[in-house]
Amino acid sequence: MLGLPERRLPSAEFLLLLPFLLLLLLLLPAAPAPHRAAYKPVIVVHGLFDSSYSFRHLLEYINETHPGTAVTVLDLFDGRESLRPLWEQVQGFREAVAPIMAKALQGVHLICYSQGGLVCRALLSVMDEHNVDSFISLSSPQMGQYGDTNYLKWLFPTSMRSNLYRICYSPWGQEFSICNYWHDPHHDDLYLNASSFLALINGERDHPNATAWRKNFLRLGRLVLIGGPDDGVITPWQSSFFGFYDANETVLEMEKQLVYLRDSFGLKTLLARGAIVRCPMAGISHTAWHSNRTLYETCIEPWLS
């Protein structure tokens, strides 16, 4: 009468099937929620006279900003044991990180503080199957140390930096981790001949593994270098960025170092592919790098994918 379309009622058969259809919908699995890729595991290596406890703030920051991240702060060579020869430490840390890497199919990140940064760089050299994405070197003397610090005065109370080479460049001295990266710019020949660690991982002295170590190091996804002028321990502080003194104690930046110009272990190649990040920050003392929130947010968090 009003020209409206006729409405048809559901058939009896449909009404009978309706409860079963509703039950079927309830039993079907729900559509999965959008999945965000998990953060890569983070491995932390401490420095001289240090332990895992020192990194409680860093652990807190990572848990807050990247919840669910598996963070392992390695508890090896703590306290005075950190004075053990660095190659001995490298072997110990290698045994600890290998199973973590093996389980992390997407790779891992390394955060390595002070002396630990040298341990980690050696790990990247000797491990031919490592899968490190970001190696974050946190105030580490990557080109060596040449300065009077409280640590040195405690260990060698009768020596000054000008004559410490007499101890460090002896077989006895090389049994101490500090001497493994002592780099006296006034006695370069002695350093090159006597250094059992730094001169080798830098490729400054020929050895049978140099080519393989360079290849291994270049498996690295990204090298993040962190340090600053108010560190107070790393001397020169530019060593954190692969800068160092010449014979006149003038600091030459990384790009003027022979290890870079010769690309002896891969620095030049990394820089050419845009894989080196430099993050200098003033106002932070050596023992505060791993607890400074601003430093974490600026220089560390962006590289923890």
Swiss-Prot record:
Residues glycosylated per entry: N193
Signal peptide: 1-32
GO molecular function per UniProt: fatty acyl-CoA hydrolase activity; palmitoyl hydrolase activity; palmitoyl-(protein) hydrolase activity; thiolester hydrolase activity
Enzyme Commission number(s) from the entry: 3.1.2.2
Keyword Metal-binding: no
Alphabetically ordered keywords of this record: Disulfide bond, Glycoprotein, Hydrolase, Lysosome, Signal
Cellular compartment(s): Lysosome
UniProt KW Hydrolase keyword: yes
Catalytic class of the enzyme: hydrolase
Catalytic residues, chain numbering: S114, D231, H286
Annotated GO CC locations: extracellular region; lysosome
Catalytic reaction annotation: hexadecanoyl-CoA + H2O = hexadecanoate + CoA + H(+); S-hexadecanoyl-N-acetylcysteamine + H2O = N-acetylcysteamine + hexadecanoate + H(+)
Disulfide bonds: C112-C120, C168-C179, C279-C299
Family label: Belongs to the palmitoyl-protein thioesterase family.
Function comment: Catalyzes the cleavage of thioester bonds from S-palmitoyl-CoA or S-palmitoyl-N-acetylcysteamine (unbranched structures) but does not have activity against palmitoylcysteine or palmitoylated proteins, branched structures or bulky head groups. Conversely, hydrolyzes both long and short chain fatty acyl-CoA substrate.
Protein name from the UniProt record: Lysosomal thioesterase PPT2
Record organism: Bos taurus
